[in-house]
């Protein structure tokens, strides 16, 4: 073995070896199955640190289950990521001065698949660098032909069941990408704005009602003024009209319970760009006319503002109203504004014909399942309540997207007819140009990735999957939708357990984003420290559901831990077998410690408590195995047993440190680690006194450290009522460079063991001088404080706080003097 740990040399070919040997591709059908689907990363770029954390957590579970004797399937997949990928491809085309409309749909899709192929290859190389135990023979892509077949079947089946429908509704609209969005694709952000208080004069009157709005660009779509029917003023205004400040049209004053009496004047303008407003307009049979188009520009109903960008128009319209004295006041105002999760621009509410999924049935199915015996287990459990809260208030899911990259909707149109089927009904029928929301295909991943409906072999064996590991930020995007899709189509939950991890934040606790420029490339870290070091840092610093703070110093510490393991392995490997040695008390002691850590790991793995696993493993290796057992082994030299326990330790460590453990297993034992499983039997133990021995050794070492006694000078000690055997005394002497003597005079007590030790004369003399000086100083300070406190002038004139300070000093000095005068033992 090399003298120094070299992560690059150790890791560079390991994953390819595992692939070549098909350790995670060949499946033993006689074993109990355990399956995980890797959450498909988007083919929009390279993996980030969050992907690394997610992959490491799953991979550690897969490797642990394999070593437990399961038939494991870790299925790799990638997501076509509709909006995100189309944005990237359009940006790439723009560099060549091309628009997607210039090249047409077919060529655009060809470019998109080329993009996908490029980044899929990059992602696969990164998976290999991470060391993920994936079954590449089962790899899937959410836009491969099998996925297309499944998506079409699911859409058609849900349409025929009346669950998917087409309707005209107010929907979330991304004006930059020009596509509909579902509610979970909209991020609400607190945004500073201006609140304009606009005068709407009553018809044929100098009286006006004051309307507060930040969105002057929507004024041209106003079709009524509303007031709450419980407002005492309502009876005086209902059935009256106001004159619109811009168009001069008559607008009726109507009532609706939605209107907040406490907001501003209590009057509200009813326009076409709010879901609540649209609902009120529909209830009152009022027309819906939009003032903002699909691109975020004002429409032809907006007079001189037609064609103006919406936010520019907001300012210009406000200026016009102010010029005409139609604004009574302007205030700074902050409120939540919806932004597109992908393009980061403020959304619009537009009335569009779109495809929707009815959510009432699916919500009930999930809620019922969560209360059943066959429910999904959430780690941490609090996220079950989060999901319940979401399912109780969910809206119908908008699933159509005005994109080209994705699953084209299997709906066909001719004149006023609509048919939903796979193939064209005949001549002159046109397919819907829209595609489905990316999450539609992701929602059916747990069964579509296993071949449904074309084949059932894998589905029967591996569905429901054993575990889903994902970020808590997509529980509504993805987890909820997989849940109801599985319940509806498979009549069973899609996974047994869900482990939700947090985000990785920078050292200032900020989310890592491109805009902040604080993202960390995991591949750079792997080059610098190794995949094992990065894995150990990430998984042992993650608690289910909580965010992680990135800390490069901890990654360096992880590398040092790997280096420690390397040095331990070198120590064991370099020793030569001599004669056979029987088990010593130290062997039994470390066996007991190992049995306990093995049990801890098993216990914590059941709840995915990786931080606790890391603490127990680290404590065993650093404190028990390295600091004590290997020291004791220099006395007993039971090399055979050292290799027995180290072999079991490497197996236990493998899920969390796969590259290094695999390498060491091959070097020391000339065997492949992944061709082994955990031992079922515990290591044999016997009652022993090694823990007491350690206490004595530590006490003598601390005595040497405290008084800075040279390591070349023997410490003389004596143990009162000594129960230790001569072999124990020999071990103490060897490991502390000391000798048993009855002339010791200073005593320390550890767990009722009285240990007497003598100080070398030169040190004792120095300590005596220091002690005398301290006593003299304390006596002087005590005398000074007493004199001051007996002085009546000081007591009467000095501030109370000063007097109390002197009393406290006197008490402290008296106590310190007593301790010094009584000092005859070493604590």
From Swiss-Prot:
GO terms for biological process: valyl-tRNA aminoacylation. It is found in: Cytoplasm. Its main location: cytoplasm. Residues 765-827 form a coiled coil. Signal peptide: none annotated. Its EC number is 6.1.1.9. GO terms for molecular function: aminoacyl-tRNA deacylase activity; ATP binding; valine-tRNA ligase activity. ATP binds at residue 514. Gene3D superfamilies: HUPs, Isoleucyl-tRNA Synthetase, Domain 1. A motif ('HIGH' region) lies at residues 41-51. A motif ('KMSKS' region) lies at residues 511-515. Pfam families: Anticodon_1 (PF08264), tRNA-synt_1 (PF00133). InterPro entries: aa-tRNA-synth_I_CS (IPR001412), aa-tRNA-synth_Ia (IPR002300), Anticodon_Ia_Val (IPR033705), M/V/L/I-tRNA-synth_anticd-bd (IPR013155), Rossmann-like_a/b/a_fold (IPR014729), tRNA-bd_arm (IPR010978), tRNAsynth_Ia_anticodon-bd (IPR009080), Val/Leu/Ile-tRNA-synth_edit (IPR009008). It catalyses: tRNA(Val) + L-valine + ATP = L-valyl-tRNA(Val) + AMP + diphosphate. HAMAP family: Val_tRNA_synth_type1. Catalyzes the attachment of valine to tRNA(Val). As ValRS can inadvertently accommodate and process structurally similar amino acids such as threonine, to avoid such errors, it has a 'posttransfer' editing activity that hydrolyzes mischarged Thr-tRNA(Val) in a tRNA-dependent manner. ValRS has two distinct active sites: one for aminoacylation and one for editing. The misactivated threonine is translocated from the active site to the editing site. This is Valine--tRNA ligase. It comes from Mycoplasmopsis pulmonis (strain UAB CTIP) (Mycoplasma pulmonis). The lineage of its organism: Bacteria, Bacillati, Mycoplasmatota, Mycoplasmoidales, Metamycoplasmataceae. The gene is valS.
